[in-house]
Amino acid sequence: MNQESSFRAPPKRRVRGSNPNISNPHQLFDDTSGGPVPHGGDFPNHSSPALGIPAQAFLSEPMSNFAMAYGSSLASQGKEMMDKNIDRIIPVSKIKYYFAVDTVYVGKKIGLLMFPYMHQDWEVRYQQDTPVAPRFDINAPDLYIPVMAFITYILVAGLALGTQSRFSPEILGMQASSALAWLIVEVLAILLSLYLVTVNTDLTTVDLVAFSGYKYVGMISGVIAGLLFGNTGYYVVLAWCCISIVFFMIRTLRLKILSEAAAEGVLVRGARNQLRMYLTMAIAAVQPIFMYWLTYHLVR
Protein backbone atom coordinates (compact mmCIF):
# COMPACT_ATOMS: atom_id res chain seq x y z
CA MET A 1 0.00 0.00 0.00
CA ASN A 2 1.40 3.33 -0.85
CA GLN A 3 1.28 6.18 1.56
CA GLU A 4 -1.21 8.22 -0.35
CA SER A 5 -3.83 5.49 -0.24
CA SER A 6 -3.40 5.05 3.53
CA PHE A 7 -5.04 8.37 4.16
CA ARG A 8 -8.70 8.77 3.29
CA ALA A 9 -9.71 11.87 1.55
CA PRO A 10 -11.72 14.12 3.84
CA PRO A 11 -15.43 14.02 3.10
CA LYS A 12 -16.89 16.89 1.26
CA ARG A 13 -19.05 19.17 3.42
CA ARG A 14 -22.49 19.78 2.09
CA VAL A 15 -23.43 23.36 1.82
CA ARG A 16 -27.02 23.96 2.96
CA GLY A 17 -29.11 24.97 0.00
CA SER A 18 -26.53 23.87 -2.57
CA ASN A 19 -28.81 21.21 -3.97
CA PRO A 20 -31.50 22.82 -6.13
CA ASN A 21 -33.78 19.82 -5.67
CA ILE A 22 -33.97 20.40 -1.92
CA SER A 23 -36.43 23.10 -0.92
CA ASN A 24 -35.82 25.87 1.53
CA PRO A 25 -36.54 24.62 5.05
CA HIS A 26 -38.11 28.01 5.92
CA GLN A 27 -40.53 27.77 2.98
CA LEU A 28 -43.97 26.48 3.98
CA PHE A 29 -45.19 25.56 0.50
CA ASP A 30 -43.44 24.35 -2.62
CA ASP A 31 -43.00 26.86 -5.39
CA THR A 32 -44.75 25.31 -8.36
CA SER A 33 -44.76 28.40 -10.56
CA GLY A 34 -41.55 27.48 -12.32
CA GLY A 35 -42.27 23.91 -13.22
CA PRO A 36 -44.76 21.08 -13.11
CA VAL A 37 -46.22 19.97 -9.84
CA PRO A 38 -44.64 16.78 -8.53
CA HIS A 39 -46.79 13.76 -9.19
CA GLY A 40 -46.70 12.79 -5.58
CA GLY A 41 -48.69 15.87 -4.49
CA ASP A 42 -51.01 16.05 -7.45
CA PHE A 43 -54.60 15.26 -6.60
CA PRO A 44 -56.63 16.06 -9.67
CA ASN A 45 -60.38 16.63 -9.28
CA HIS A 46 -61.88 14.58 -12.07
CA SER A 47 -65.37 15.92 -11.28
CA SER A 48 -64.44 19.55 -12.01
CA PRO A 49 -64.54 21.02 -15.49
CA ALA A 50 -61.72 23.03 -16.95
CA LEU A 51 -62.92 26.36 -15.54
CA GLY A 52 -62.88 25.20 -11.96
CA ILE A 53 -66.70 25.34 -11.53
CA PRO A 54 -68.24 22.24 -9.97
CA ALA A 55 -70.26 20.09 -12.29
CA GLN A 56 -73.32 20.46 -10.03
CA ALA A 57 -73.38 24.18 -10.79
CA PHE A 58 -74.03 23.44 -14.46
CA LEU A 59 -76.99 21.34 -13.41
CA SER A 60 -78.35 23.63 -10.68
CA GLU A 61 -77.97 26.96 -12.52
CA PRO A 62 -80.69 26.26 -15.15
CA MET A 63 -82.99 24.98 -12.42
CA SER A 64 -82.46 28.08 -10.29
CA ASN A 65 -83.04 30.37 -13.27
CA PHE A 66 -86.23 28.51 -14.10
CA ALA A 67 -87.39 28.72 -10.48
CA MET A 68 -86.69 32.45 -10.36
CA ALA A 69 -88.53 33.05 -13.62
CA TYR A 70 -91.47 30.95 -12.48
CA GLY A 71 -91.59 32.73 -9.13
CA SER A 72 -91.49 36.14 -10.79
CA SER A 73 -94.30 35.11 -13.11
CA LEU A 74 -96.43 33.94 -10.18
CA ALA A 75 -95.73 37.16 -8.26
CA SER A 76 -96.69 39.35 -11.22
CA GLN A 77 -99.87 37.35 -11.82
CA GLY A 78 -100.78 37.57 -8.14
CA LYS A 79 -100.18 41.32 -8.13
CA GLU A 80 -102.40 41.77 -11.20
CA MET A 81 -105.18 39.70 -9.66
CA MET A 82 -104.94 41.62 -6.38
CA ASP A 83 -105.00 44.97 -8.20
CA LYS A 84 -108.07 43.89 -10.18
CA ASN A 85 -109.90 42.75 -7.05
CA ILE A 86 -108.99 45.91 -5.14
CA ASP A 87 -109.98 48.09 -8.08
CA ARG A 88 -113.27 46.18 -8.30
CA ILE A 89 -114.04 46.98 -4.65
CA ILE A 90 -112.30 50.36 -4.36
CA PRO A 91 -111.72 52.16 -7.68
CA VAL A 92 -108.24 53.39 -6.84
CA SER A 93 -107.66 54.87 -10.30
CA LYS A 94 -110.88 56.85 -10.03
CA ILE A 95 -110.18 58.01 -6.48
CA LYS A 96 -106.88 59.51 -7.63
CA TYR A 97 -108.92 61.92 -9.74
CA TYR A 98 -110.50 63.41 -6.61
CA PHE A 99 -107.11 64.21 -5.10
CA ALA A 100 -105.72 65.96 -8.19
CA VAL A 101 -105.72 69.40 -6.55
CA ASP A 102 -103.27 72.20 -5.95
CA THR A 103 -102.97 75.12 -3.58
CA VAL A 104 -104.79 77.53 -5.88
CA TYR A 105 -107.75 75.20 -6.21
CA VAL A 106 -107.97 74.61 -2.46
CA GLY A 107 -107.99 78.34 -1.75
CA LYS A 108 -110.62 79.07 -4.39
CA LYS A 109 -112.82 76.15 -3.34
CA ILE A 110 -112.80 77.16 0.32
CA GLY A 111 -113.69 80.69 -0.75
CA LEU A 112 -116.53 79.29 -2.86
CA LEU A 113 -117.82 77.27 0.10
CA MET A 114 -117.82 80.34 2.34
CA PHE A 115 -119.01 82.91 -0.23
CA PRO A 116 -120.90 81.12 -3.03
CA TYR A 117 -123.33 83.94 -3.77
CA MET A 118 -121.34 85.74 -6.45
CA HIS A 119 -120.34 82.62 -8.38
CA GLN A 120 -122.05 82.40 -11.79
CA ASP A 121 -120.86 79.34 -13.72
CA TRP A 122 -121.62 76.13 -11.80
CA GLU A 123 -121.26 73.58 -14.59
CA VAL A 124 -118.48 71.01 -14.48
CA ARG A 125 -116.21 71.13 -17.51
CA TYR A 126 -115.59 68.00 -19.55
CA GLN A 127 -112.84 66.93 -21.90
CA GLN A 128 -113.65 64.04 -24.24
CA ASP A 129 -116.63 62.95 -22.10
CA THR A 130 -114.44 62.94 -19.00
CA PRO A 131 -114.56 65.63 -16.30
CA VAL A 132 -111.36 67.58 -15.99
CA ALA A 133 -109.26 67.32 -12.86
CA PRO A 134 -110.36 69.46 -9.91
CA ARG A 135 -107.28 71.66 -10.11
CA PHE A 136 -108.50 72.83 -13.52
CA ASP A 137 -112.16 73.30 -12.55
CA ILE A 138 -113.37 74.83 -9.31
CA ASN A 139 -116.80 73.22 -9.76
CA ALA A 140 -115.42 69.67 -9.81
CA PRO A 141 -115.85 67.70 -6.58
CA ASP A 142 -112.75 66.61 -4.72
CA LEU A 143 -111.90 64.51 -1.69
CA TYR A 144 -108.86 66.43 -0.50
CA ILE A 145 -110.81 69.23 1.19
CA PRO A 146 -113.38 66.89 2.85
CA VAL A 147 -110.69 64.55 4.19
CA MET A 148 -108.48 67.35 5.48
CA ALA A 149 -111.52 69.16 6.90
CA PHE A 150 -112.64 66.01 8.72
CA ILE A 151 -109.20 65.52 10.28
CA THR A 152 -109.01 69.21 11.21
CA TYR A 153 -112.48 69.02 12.74
CA ILE A 154 -111.33 66.20 15.03
CA LEU A 155 -108.26 68.21 16.07
CA VAL A 156 -110.30 71.36 16.71
CA ALA A 157 -112.81 69.31 18.69
CA GLY A 158 -109.97 68.00 20.85
CA LEU A 159 -108.75 71.55 21.37
CA ALA A 160 -112.23 72.72 22.36
CA LEU A 161 -112.65 69.84 24.79
CA GLY A 162 -109.23 70.55 26.24
CA THR A 163 -110.06 74.20 26.96
CA GLN A 164 -113.11 72.98 28.89
CA SER A 165 -111.11 70.33 30.83
CA ARG A 166 -113.21 67.61 29.24
CA PHE A 167 -110.60 66.09 26.96
CA SER A 168 -109.90 62.37 27.00
CA PRO A 169 -108.89 59.94 24.26
CA GLU A 170 -112.17 58.07 24.67
CA ILE A 171 -114.29 61.18 24.19
CA LEU A 172 -112.24 62.26 21.18
CA GLY A 173 -112.57 58.78 19.69
CA MET A 174 -116.32 58.87 20.17
CA GLN A 175 -116.40 62.30 18.53
CA ALA A 176 -114.56 61.00 15.46
CA SER A 177 -116.63 57.81 15.30
CA SER A 178 -119.93 59.66 15.54
CA ALA A 179 -118.93 62.15 12.85
CA LEU A 180 -117.88 59.34 10.51
CA ALA A 181 -121.01 57.31 11.28
CA TRP A 182 -123.32 60.25 10.52
CA LEU A 183 -121.47 60.85 7.26
CA ILE A 184 -121.99 57.23 6.21
CA VAL A 185 -125.66 57.37 7.20
CA GLU A 186 -126.13 60.56 5.19
CA VAL A 187 -124.52 59.12 2.05
CA LEU A 188 -126.52 55.88 2.30
CA ALA A 189 -129.75 57.84 2.79
CA ILE A 190 -129.03 59.93 -0.31
CA LEU A 191 -128.26 56.82 -2.37
CA LEU A 192 -131.49 55.21 -1.23
CA SER A 193 -133.45 58.35 -2.06
CA LEU A 194 -131.93 58.54 -5.53
CA TYR A 195 -132.84 54.90 -6.08
CA LEU A 196 -136.43 55.37 -4.94
CA VAL A 197 -136.91 58.48 -7.05
CA THR A 198 -135.28 56.67 -10.01
CA VAL A 199 -132.98 59.53 -10.89
CA ASN A 200 -130.63 58.92 -13.81
CA THR A 201 -127.62 60.94 -12.78
CA ASP A 202 -123.87 60.78 -13.14
CA LEU A 203 -123.43 61.28 -9.40
CA THR A 204 -121.25 58.57 -7.92
CA THR A 205 -120.86 57.49 -4.32
CA VAL A 206 -117.53 59.28 -4.14
CA ASP A 207 -119.21 62.47 -5.39
CA LEU A 208 -121.76 62.22 -2.60
CA VAL A 209 -119.01 61.70 -0.03
CA ALA A 210 -117.25 64.79 -1.35
CA PHE A 211 -120.35 66.98 -1.30
CA SER A 212 -121.35 65.73 2.15
CA GLY A 213 -117.85 66.35 3.48
CA TYR A 214 -117.73 70.01 2.47
CA LYS A 215 -119.82 70.96 5.52
CA TYR A 216 -116.83 70.28 7.80
CA VAL A 217 -115.27 73.52 6.56
CA GLY A 218 -118.16 75.50 8.03
CA MET A 219 -118.13 73.40 11.20
CA ILE A 220 -114.46 74.19 11.77
CA SER A 221 -115.11 77.89 11.25
CA GLY A 222 -117.98 77.85 13.74
CA VAL A 223 -116.02 76.04 16.46
CA ILE A 224 -112.99 78.31 16.06
CA ALA A 225 -115.23 81.38 16.24
CA GLY A 226 -116.79 79.96 19.40
CA LEU A 227 -113.38 79.46 20.98
CA LEU A 228 -112.36 83.03 20.15
CA PHE A 229 -115.59 84.97 20.64
CA GLY A 230 -117.82 82.72 22.71
CA ASN A 231 -121.33 81.56 21.93
CA THR A 232 -122.21 84.70 19.98
CA GLY A 233 -119.34 84.23 17.56
CA TYR A 234 -120.17 80.55 17.22
CA TYR A 235 -123.81 81.08 16.29
CA VAL A 236 -123.12 83.97 13.92
CA VAL A 237 -120.37 82.20 11.98
CA LEU A 238 -122.19 78.86 11.99
CA ALA A 239 -125.38 80.49 10.68
CA TRP A 240 -123.43 82.10 7.85
CA CYS A 241 -121.74 78.82 6.97
CA CYS A 242 -125.06 76.95 7.06
CA ILE A 243 -126.68 79.37 4.64
CA SER A 244 -123.62 79.21 2.39
CA ILE A 245 -123.53 75.41 2.28
CA VAL A 246 -127.26 75.23 1.52
CA PHE A 247 -126.84 77.66 -1.36
CA PHE A 248 -123.77 75.78 -2.59
CA MET A 249 -125.47 72.37 -2.47
CA ILE A 250 -128.58 73.56 -4.29
CA ARG A 251 -126.66 75.24 -7.08
CA THR A 252 -124.35 72.25 -7.47
CA LEU A 253 -126.78 69.34 -7.14
CA ARG A 254 -129.50 70.88 -9.29
CA LEU A 255 -127.27 70.27 -12.29
CA LYS A 256 -126.79 66.66 -11.24
CA ILE A 257 -130.22 65.61 -9.99
CA LEU A 258 -132.76 67.78 -11.78
CA SER A 259 -133.61 67.25 -15.41
CA GLU A 260 -131.78 69.10 -18.17
CA ALA A 261 -134.70 71.47 -18.61
CA ALA A 262 -134.66 72.41 -14.94
CA ALA A 263 -130.89 72.80 -15.00
CA GLU A 264 -131.22 75.30 -17.80
CA GLY A 265 -133.67 77.36 -15.77
CA VAL A 266 -136.92 76.16 -17.36
CA LEU A 267 -139.92 75.83 -15.06
CA VAL A 268 -139.99 72.41 -13.42
CA ARG A 269 -143.06 70.41 -14.45
CA GLY A 270 -144.21 66.88 -13.78
CA ALA A 271 -144.34 64.77 -10.65
CA ARG A 272 -140.93 63.20 -11.21
CA ASN A 273 -139.20 66.55 -11.59
CA GLN A 274 -141.02 67.79 -8.48
CA LEU A 275 -139.64 64.83 -6.54
CA ARG A 276 -136.15 65.56 -7.81
CA MET A 277 -136.47 69.18 -6.74
CA TYR A 278 -137.65 68.18 -3.28
CA LEU A 279 -134.80 65.69 -3.00
CA THR A 280 -132.27 68.38 -3.90
CA MET A 281 -133.76 70.73 -1.30
CA ALA A 282 -133.76 67.98 1.33
CA ILE A 283 -130.10 67.11 0.76
CA ALA A 284 -129.18 70.78 1.08
CA ALA A 285 -131.41 71.36 4.12
CA VAL A 286 -130.00 68.45 6.11
CA GLN A 287 -126.48 69.93 6.04
CA PRO A 288 -127.12 72.62 8.71
CA ILE A 289 -128.71 70.00 10.98
CA PHE A 290 -125.56 67.90 10.96
CA MET A 291 -123.37 70.98 11.32
CA TYR A 292 -125.16 72.06 14.48
CA TRP A 293 -125.55 68.55 15.90
CA LEU A 294 -121.82 67.81 15.68
CA THR A 295 -120.56 71.14 17.05
CA TYR A 296 -122.98 72.64 19.59
CA HIS A 297 -121.55 70.65 22.54
CA LEU A 298 -118.00 71.82 21.74
CA VAL A 299 -118.69 75.48 22.58
CA ARG A 300 -119.82 76.51 26.05
Swiss-Prot record:
Signal peptide as annotated in the record: none
Keyword Endoplasmic reticulum assigned: yes
UniProt keywords, alphabetically: Endoplasmic reticulum, Golgi apparatus, Membrane, Protein transport, Transmembrane, Transmembrane helix, Transport
Keyword field contains Disulfide bond: no
Superkingdom per UniProt: Eukaryota
TM helices/strands, residue ranges: 143-163, 179-199, 206-226, 228-248, 279-299
SS bond list: none
Stretches of the chain found on the membrane's Extracellular side: 164-178, 227, 300
Membrane topology, from the record: Multi-pass membrane protein
GO cellular component: COPII-coated ER to Golgi transport vesicle; endoplasmic reticulum; endoplasmic reticulum membrane; endoplasmic reticulum-Golgi intermediate compartment; endoplasmic reticulum-Golgi intermediate compartment membrane; Golgi apparatus; Golgi membrane
Cytoplasmic side: 1-142, 200-205, 249-278
Annotated region described as Disordered, given as residue ranges: 1-46
Cellular compartment(s): Endoplasmic reticulum membrane; Golgi apparatus membrane; Endoplasmic reticulum-Golgi intermediate compartment membrane
InterPro entries per UniProt: Yif1_fam (IPR005578)
Family indicated by similarity: Belongs to the YIF1 family.
Biological role: Functions in endoplasmic reticulum to Golgi vesicle-mediated transport and regulates the proper organization of the endoplasmic reticulum and the Golgi. Plays a key role in targeting to neuronal dendrites receptors such as HTR1A. Plays also a role in primary cilium and sperm flagellum assembly probably through protein transport to these compartments.
Entry protein name: Protein YIF1B-B
The organism of origin for this protein: Xenopus laevis
